Amino acid sequence: MPNNPVSLIRKKRDGVSLSADEIRWLIREYTADRLPDYQMSAFLMAAYLNGLDAVEAAALCEAMLHSGVVLDLSDIPGVKVDKHSTGGVGDKLSLILAPVAAACGVPVPMISGRGLGHSGGTLDKLESIPGFNVNLDLDRYRRVLRAHNLVLIGQTDDIAPADKRMYALRDVTATVECIPLIAASIMSKKLAEGIDALVLDVKVGSGAFMKTTEQALELARTLVSIGEAAGKRTVAYLTNMDQPLGYEIGNWNEVREALDVLGGGGPEDVRELSLLLAGTMVWLGGKAGSVEEGIALGRAAIDDGSARQVFIDVAAAQDADVTVLRHPDRYPTGGVSVDVVATDAGVVRGFDSYALGMAAVELGAGRLRTDDRIDPVAGITLTSKIGDRVAKGAVLATVRTATRTAEVAERIAETVRAAIRLGPGSQNPPKWVTHVVNRDGTFLY
């Protein structure tokens, strides 16, 4: 009996699981414009209310994946490995871990996104480097990857077009916050890259889209389940986003901090998390016998300068003016800067990371509308982490913008002040990593 969209929507509405073939049929009909938006919207709401089981989520991902181009990188030697982050504040880890893994011999075909809401995007950070071209055709994409073990580009319209259309529907039908739909959306785009393995950084906390450990674990398990069902080794880590990563928020700010780490310095949290994720990529890529060995190899690639050189070489291959990567102090800056000063002494008890991310967007580091232009120098430089003691009159942060007035910068500085919570006594810093999820289960880290 042929499939009927109304009967499939009714089944999902009533909490009945659909078969993989039924899911594939729905997506195929929708992609071919034989299923209207109103029926897909009804299906999405039914899925939101009743959930999708592992078979349904994997089938949805597979159907969206094959709605467009799936890259075949089998002619590129080695195990291709990528990393995906669910988004946070000050998250510049991709700029570090990708060249580290590449320097260790692992091909990294990284397709990244732009900023989303309060969360910064890797593409916007890369484009703060003058001339960096994230829009390469497939032939050049392969050439750069083959030459340097790394390529850094943006998503194209050819990759998972069904997901793009369905995401737009979810955005206007209040069905975004559905973990199986989120997971299928993420994995359909990642698997289209032609990778063999994937490392996932699932953020949890005030600056993450997942606010609780329970939500983050459910997402991590679903992502790993989909990846493994597709035959890709997949490992997820739950990492803390109750405070920004490092001290820099903004596009060029974060590139500069990533260069500090690639140069052997930089903040400890950024360095160690980058090495954990890169070390896992090196292990999955077959260049190390364990994650620990992969971390050691990654650390050596930073120490000997090879990881930093890979980043510079890839930037040059993608048309960037690498002068500012070799000499970050030559980057053109200007505009307005305002210091945020502590009105009382105390200990940093916490941050409203979401508010800090949105403050950076208001300064010009992100988009309030889709046609907004990014200000590459806009951002926030913090001076402390949770648990640090701060003196009265000390600078808590500096806000910078080249496209906003001094009055706007002063107002945003007050938002930043309110987002840094000071108090008496002492405060233990949060653990950077709490859990690891892989095909064998969920484990405390």
Model feature map: region roles:
Residues I111, L145, I153-T156, D201-G205, ...:
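Short beta-strand segments
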Residues V79-A102, V106-H118:
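Glycine/serine-rich anion-binding loops at beta->alpha junctions
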Residues K125-V151, R221-G227, G231:
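A glycine-rich helix N-cap at a beta->alpha junction
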Residues R146-I195:
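Phosphate/diphosphate-binding glycine-rich loops and adjacent basic-rich segments that engage nucleotide
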Residues L44-Y48, K125, D163-V172, D201-M210, ...:
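Active-site-proximal beta-alpha loop/turn segments in soluble metabolic enzymes
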Residues L49-N50, L95-P109, K189-G194, I226-A230, ...:
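Alpha-helix C-terminal capping segments
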Residues S7, K12, S17-A20, K80, ...:
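Well-ordered secondary-structure scaffolds
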Residues M1-G90, V310-A317, D321, W432, ...:
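Acidic, glycine/proline-rich low-complexity segments that act as flexible tails and inter-domain linkers
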